[in-house]
Amino acid sequence: MMNSNEIRQSFLDFFKERGHTILPSASLVPESPNLLFTNAGMNPFVPFFLGKQKCPYVPPRIADSQKCLRAGGKHNDLEEVGYDTYHHTFFEMLGNWSFNDYFKEEAIHWAWELLTQKWGFPKERIYATVYKPAPDEPGEFDEEAFRIWFKLFQKAKLNPLLHIHFGTKKDNFWMMGETGPCGPCSEIHIDLTPDGQSEGKLINKNSPLCIEIWNLVFIQLNANEDGSFSLLPSRHVDTGMGLERVCAIIQGTSSFRQFNRTISDYDTDLFIPLIEKLQDISKVSYTGSIPPTPDFALDPQLKKDIAFRVIVDHVRALAFAIADGILPSNLGRGHVLRRLLRRAIRFGQILGVNPPFLFEMVDPLVKIMGSHYPELIDKQGHIEEVISSEEELFARTLSHGLALFEEIKQKMIAEKRKEISGKEAFVLYDTYGFPLDLTQLLAKEQGFSVDTQGFERLMAEQRRRSLLSHEEDIVSLTKTSQFVGYEELEAEAEVVVLLSANRAIFDRTPFYAEMGGQVGDKGYVVFDQKKIEVLDTMKSASGAHVHRLAFTDDLKPGSRVYLQVDEKRRRCIAAHHTATHLLHWALRKVLGPETLQRGSYVGPDRLRFDFSHTGPLSAEELAEIERLVNEKIELNDPVTAEEESYEKVKNNPDILQLFGEKYGQRVRIVSVGRYSKELCGGTHVRSTGEIGYFKILGEYGVSAGIRRIEAACGKALEQFLHAQAAEQDKKWQILHSKDPSLPRLSKWVDTLDLDSLIEIFQRRNEELSSFEKEIKEREKLRAKKQEENFRREASQQAMAAIAQVEKIGAIPVLFLDCDAKPQSYLPLLWNEISKRIDSVAILASRSEGKINLFIGVGPSLTTKIEARNLLSQLVASFEGKGGGSKTIAQGGLKDSIEISSLFEKGRGILEQYGGQKGQTEPKATG
């Protein structure tokens, strides 16, 4: 059975063999100003369809897998996500295109060949739709497509009249807009009913048992402004097939061997690792339940399963959008991202998870999709940081906002009204950052509605109030600054504009703006005998250096000021930046030329360097890399920079470029000696001797095929060592509290030279490692002895418990209160019980400030009852959480609960199971 990467690649290979140029996915940020996001596979090729550009490939055929996002504007699937098996905000669209080259014959034949011969779709389960217009609809019956399909089904010994269905403009005519290129389309559907005998009766009926998998669009007409349609001089093919849907069909039917269950995109390898990670985080089990109808009353497990699907969907959308340079904000695309993130956090609360937690799900996503989308690997750290910081930002106001919502709810109940006023919704938005759709989601859960018109009126008023300052900011960000900071650290300048939040742009500046992994400069603005601290420097979209100041006071546009960069800080940053170039060179020397930079952080305190490599580096490799860097530092080689046109240098193999970076027309080439050349806009030392001693502090993996080295040099290294020495002392204190007999660490002497400090630091690390190992061994022996005692005790308790078995219907059941035993004791006890009797056991104990709960179900009883289902109902009654499998499940509850009440509730639930044979989900008890 193929996984998602194999399915995607086989599609691309299939069309490559048929003369198509394979293109990487375009960005989620579209070229068109009319689109929020790239939301369809054809978006990047609109200029070809419109005739504004000629397809540059010979033959003019393209295939790709395009990233798409639908979460705002006209194409918006947000509200459907989670409530069914196939709607997503982010998805991949597999597509092949012909620009005035092949047409219907090849497009249909190749689609049939890929599906039935390459992928093995059962021919008898495939149905095709063909355009047949109703009166007053454009164009004519697509007889050409009909005849092609007729012959294919006839050749497959299938009845074409059963397998070809006709559709009107609604389903089988594609238009780019009110005017412009358009044409009929032919959809391919697959019958997923158990017997495969639906005869196409479920086509376009929103049934999960008959799914559209591929749409073949034949662009042959032009919609004119007068409402008429005319033939285009050139004809094109545009096809689209959702990767998630294909994976669901192939994997959900075990390569077409099983059709006895509803397939789901979320049961594929694109989503399963994310769901498993979320189960680990939340300690809640995902069961895959789906509401049978949109208005179905949701029970607790359905709500949780919907939450799982919403969260894993939104994490995918967030990660890919951030990788393409979109950041959460209050405007445009950024606002959509912020809404997605806050919705995901709200659904996380249904699982009992509080932020930050979404960022933890980026790593499994990178492992799933990073091989095809390297931008995920390159930007993983950035994606995690953005999501985590945004989660923390919202977490600070979430609880207050929810408290206000609760007040609103109680007030509404008292006033017997069902609609949240526009003012109440606006306060939640304006004060606590709740997007309108989040308030609507909360309202929906309570059976309320929201006065959206009133909300929009208040929003419009707020926009009018802020319009002046907003326009000022937007206009000002068209300004540019002259950067003089390569040569100067102080400069006279004039204030060009003051922005909100104490930000300022000057006509010229020595302050480096954060870019390319290097942090922005700090320092001072001297004005009117006052020093104003510069807290950070960033770059605007127009290239202006935006300085964030502690205050602006009397500053105004036109003010003459004196700018001073923090020289010590800048020198540390410059040393670390040049050190990254030396490190890059040394890595390629030791590991091979295929080793390339995949990201970096250059700050005053240390450097971080991500690079492509499989597997950890050996101690010998790290030592050699460190030796090579320090060797070049000792040689005091010159560091020079020159500007050149990008066109002239872009194909020069001797000049390294950062993968995925977009360069301007003019670039800066930084050379170290005669051995290192890189495109780089950062600040550097004048010669390598200024770097000082270089030390690798750590090496570890950050994602599949990407390793990270952290290092420091010179004065920053010395400060790091002193700080770490204090941490070593703290660590020793913790270990000493566990074992007072531990000897003291080697003494730290602040006044020693750097080489001696490094030597003592390493010796102390070795001592701590030895102490830790010794204590771990003792704890391991202690734990082993405790487990042996527990096993003996569990065996004795299990023997005695057999006499306490009670029958509930046909089910033998044990309820055991294990007093103050830890959670680890309960599975040992179940193991002993299950050796002796096939039963259902509900075990509980009270320890570490909570109730531990364990449920075991004997293998012969799982057809009647599953442990995870029983647990989910039990913990839901007491606001606990947990998860598990068919045979075992465990969870935790508040310490205030009486175990006898817990058992009584369990008994009531089991009575429902015991009385109904073969039932896997009993009716809820009161």
Swiss-Prot record:
It is an enzyme of class 6 (ligase). Its cofactor is Zn(2+). Its EC number is 6.1.1.7. GO terms for cellular component: cytosol. One of its GO terms (molecular function) is alanine-tRNA ligase activity. Its main location: cytoplasm. Belongs to the class-II aminoacyl-tRNA synthetase family. Catalyzes the attachment of alanine to tRNA(Ala) in a two-step reaction: alanine is first activated by ATP to form Ala-AMP and then transferred to the acceptor end of tRNA(Ala). Also edits incorrectly charged Ser-tRNA(Ala) and Gly-tRNA(Ala) via its editing domain. NCBIfam families: alaS. This is Alanine--tRNA ligase. It comes from Methylacidiphilum infernorum (isolate V4) (Methylokorus infernorum (strain V4)).
